[in-house]
Amino acid sequence: MHNTAIKTAPNDNVAIVATPTGLKRGSIVLGTTVLVEEIPMGHKVALQTLEMGDEVRRYGQVIGYATRTIEKGSWVNEGNISLPEPPKLEVIEYKPVLPPVEDDEELKAQLRKVSFMGYRNADGSVGTKNVLAITTSVQCVAGITNFIENKIRKELLPLYPNVDDVVAFNHSYGCGVAIDAPGAIVPIRTIKNIAQNPNFGGEVMIIGLGCEKLRPEKIAPPSGEGGLSILYLQDERFEGFYEMVDGIMELAETHLQKLNQRQRTRCSVADLVVGMQCGGSDAFSGLTGNPVSGFAADLIVKAGGTVFFSEVTEVRDAIHLLVPRAMDETVAQKLKDEMAWYDNYLYQGQADRSANTTPGNKGGGLSNIVEKALGSVAKSGTSPIVDVVSPGEKVRKKGLNFVATPASDFACGTLQLAAGMNMHVFITGRGTPYGLNMVPVIKVSSNSKLANRWHDLIDFDAGPVAFGEKTIEEMGWALFHLILEVASGTKKVATDKLGLYNDLVLFNPGPLT
């Protein structure tokens, strides 16, 4: 393979080594740069000599400052660059840079004729799976619900072939918490909104203990919406464990009977609600996987659908690029408000956004959170941001939304479920078996080395973009079509084939008691 290094923007003074084996000292890249040391795949090479204090630029943006002289051809990494200050929220002005609305009317018209086969719900939402969800109001019942989940899967699901799975949503909330504290609204509305996810068909089954602070009625949908049942384990009619089990199994059957009647029907792409997330990111994430996913996101938005991206600490250092994409000044201010809230949240915990990057990120070539954030936002595509959704809330508008979440894969996925996603696209460069059993998770690899090694864990390889074998546009269309196939149930994702699922993790900024 040829010596390959990728320069992201014309004024960058570093390039990314793309050769899978890395490059040896003496290798020549981009015509004139001779490596003075061995540099691993994904890491940066200096394209000019940088003196102490000089800007280090990638994506056309400053990602750091040289802490000492860095010779041309040297390895640029977290050891020789310093972290810049984050963009100051108070000085970022709203100067809209929105794409012309008339440029792609023909494409929009074509996309709005595209369809997939989904489960239409009574409230108009559409599911891509047909799942019996058991919601819990307190951690105390988790042992019972785990037992019940296995029993239903073994004994009842075979009798209801149209139901894909049963899922118990256990969590650590419900008691021993300051239930009336301002931050308590986040976990409470998260639990409530997850129970109403479109993939559950409007069937809400809540198991409570009976004495908990979080009353099941508080997380139930408004009266009259869908099928709701609440069962307390402390109900005096239950004599012992097996009577509890029988009571829950009887309740589950009433919901399974209704879910089993659901049938897939032709639905518009406008019915898709796709959550974009990245985890285990590397230097290629912002070159391949995220831009490809962003292109697919733009297609879904053009078709009238809903897409959201998240992870506050992974957009904080790119907020100056996002504010101009806000649909109006109100949305721009909401973006800045969510950044400010999280800045304060981290400050109260005596941390800052630099705590985000992992050893894996750095091993994959990401020197700091600035570089990571600039690549992370590429998965949002180029569409205008129509709304900002606070943690635990549902999306309110079609189009591209920012759903404010922590960057933790598990907390982010949980909050995106609460926001109403019926499809999940997860981009990784280092690799993670992350999966959710409530929603299909399409795993996108940023590099072919990972995709080849994890051939049965990765659903889509965006790596060919790095070497010019495919364009972002070509791969974006391919991912778009894969999303439709998975949403229709005609193709299974790797996590569903292998049964690899993570627990949900509630984000609780409120105090424990």
Residue ranges and their predicted role:
Residues 1-423, 427, 432, 438-513:
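Metallocofactor- and cofactor-centric catalytic cores in central/energy metabolism, strongly enriched
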